[in-house]
Amino acid sequence: MATGWGSLLQDEQQLEELARQAVDRALAEGVLLRTSQAPSSSHVVSYAPFTLFPSPVPSALLEQAYAVQADFNLLVDAVSQNAVFLEQTLSSTIKRDSFTARLFDIHKQVLKEGIAQTVFLGLNRSDYMFQCNPDGSAALKQIEINTVSASFGGLASRTPAVHRHVLSVLGKTKEAAKILSNNPSKGLAMGIAKAWELYGSANAQVLLIAQEKERNIFDQRAIENELLARNIHVIRRKFEDVSEKGSLDQDRRLFMDGQEIAVVYFRDGYMPGHYSLQNWEARLLLERSCAVKCPDIATQLAGTKKVQQELSRVGVLESFLPGQPEAVARLRATFAGLYSLDLGEEGDQAITKAIAAPSCFVLKPQREGGGNNLYGEEMVQALERLKDSEERASYILMEKIEPEPFRNCLLRPGSPARVIQCISELGIFGVYVREGKTLVMNKHVGHLLRTKAIEHADGGVAAGVAVLDNPYPV
């Protein structure tokens, strides 16, 4: 997957000058994060880490990832509506994973009371890597699907201009023209706006559940600004604020500070550390309301690793997408090997295989946010500890994807420009809206490319490992 940046990466003086220009353009374009020293304040900000050059992505795999996104939207939506499947699939996990168990408890309470919301909104991001086959070709393999707080749609809208600028400075105008336009924040806002419209109350607002210490606020503001341009007002609140000032009326309409809420958009609530007892009570209040939750609790559960693993079993996709063999084939083509670790012969065999060949597998807990997976010797030690315990059911085992590395230059605040061997992860943003049983929107709305040094096994931009990038189609 050669791109022709090779000679450019060898001229240290030119790289330093290009890096200065690229950083200034990134700041001008709004590729920004708050600092780790002051994550609650925008008084001092920095550029978000990014690559100096766009990275090579096979055009066919980019097209394949876009083509399958509507299928993944349908699949997640179908899973979220199947309470029996969710209960059966997560039954072993919730015995040992307290976070998934708490989410599932809320799911059961809402089902028992009766789901009040009639409009459903999914904003997700399906993430892939490019498996390098023995013959040198590359294959698209899904890492995971993020159904809650799928981030960087805002900043990904602003990075193409930076890479076009870098290539233009070098006189590479043809190459600059190959960088795809990309505006996920506009598409994500379109989904929220559609859900708001279907809710049917012109004065209702969108409630964005956020953390107080939020370095990635500019990513979120991009979506807020798109909504405001449509005259849809967004209020940012923490779970604690919902506990103190949120309420439901007799029709289970949600009010915040006396203002009716049409859509609740979660940019918090996807990790155990995000919840105190008070926050769990706030989440239940939100779920009980007729406001459109993005995601509702069932959709968050549909995005767990255990559900991902069960969907890879023979016949399961067909049960969710009956009469759609082409969609099933598109989905299955992206699946890597996924293995249950539930107690029993199947789980025992998976553990034996992984301990025998640790370089071929990844051990994944039911966690979002990056930096949670175990590899190599660390994975072997965990499996040896877990193999006779019920706790192993809170993990899944996944075939390790081995992409072909390439060289790029990574730019991080406070660090020198660094040319290094890298690998990339491609995310495709999907949006769907359903009213009752009728799907009224189902589309892909843009992409995100993140790149990291091959020495880092796990973790994304927010975890401080990967940097923002753009695909250079090859």
Curated annotation (Swiss-Prot):
Native source species: Bos taurus (Bovine)
Summarize the protein's role.
Answer: Catalyzes the production of glutathione from gamma-glutamylcysteine and glycine in an ATP-dependent manner. Glutathione (gamma-glutamylcysteinylglycine, GSH) is the most abundant intracellular thiol in living aerobic cells and is required for numerous processes including the protection of cells against oxidative damage, amino acid transport, the detoxification of foreign compounds, the maintenance of protein sulfhydryl groups in a reduced state and acts as a cofactor for a number of enzymes. Participates in ophthalmate biosynthesis in hepatocytes.
**Entry keyword annotation includes Phosphoprotein:** yes
| Positions contributing to ATP binding | 144, 305, 364-373, 375, 398-401, 425, 452, 458
Q: Quote the protein name from its UniProt record.
A: Glutathione synthetase
Q: Which SUPFAM superfamilies match?
A: Glutathione synthetase ATP-binding domain-like, PreATP-grasp domain
Q: Which parts of the sequence carry Phosphoserine?
A: S415
> What cofactor does this one take?
Mg(2+)
- Annotated NCBIfam families: glut_syn_euk
* The organism's place on the tree of life at top rank: Eukaryota
> Which residues are recorded as binding substrate?
125, 148-151, 214-216, 220, 267-270, 450, 461-462
The record's note on quaternary structure and interaction partners says: Homodimer.
Residues where N-acetylalanine is found: A2
User: Mind telling me which residue stretches traverse the membrane in this protein?
Assistant: none
Q: In which pathway does it act?
A: Sulfur metabolism; glutathione biosynthesis; glutathione from L-cysteine and L-glutamate: step 2/2
EC class name: ligase
> According to its UniProt record, what is one Pfam family this protein matches?
GSH_synthase
* GO CC annotation: cytosol
Question: Which reactions is this enzyme annotated as catalysing?
Answer: gamma-L-glutamyl-L-cysteine + glycine + ATP = glutathione + ADP + phosphate + H(+); gamma-L-glutamyl-(2S)-2-aminobutanoate + glycine + ATP = ophthalmate + ADP + phosphate + H(+)
Q: Which family does it belong to?
A: Belongs to the eukaryotic GSH synthase family.
Sorted alphabetically, the keyword list is: Acetylation, ATP-binding, Glutathione biosynthesis, Ligase, Magnesium, Metal-binding, Nucleotide-binding, Phosphoprotein
Give the classification, highest ranks.
Answer: Eukaryota, Metazoa, Chordata, Craniata, Vertebrata
Single annotated GO MF:
glutathione binding
Q: How is the cofactor bound?
A: Binds 1 Mg(2+) ion per subunit.
Chain's gene name = GSS
Task: Tell me which residues bind Mg(2+).
Answer: E144, N146, E368
Give the EC number.
6.3.2.3
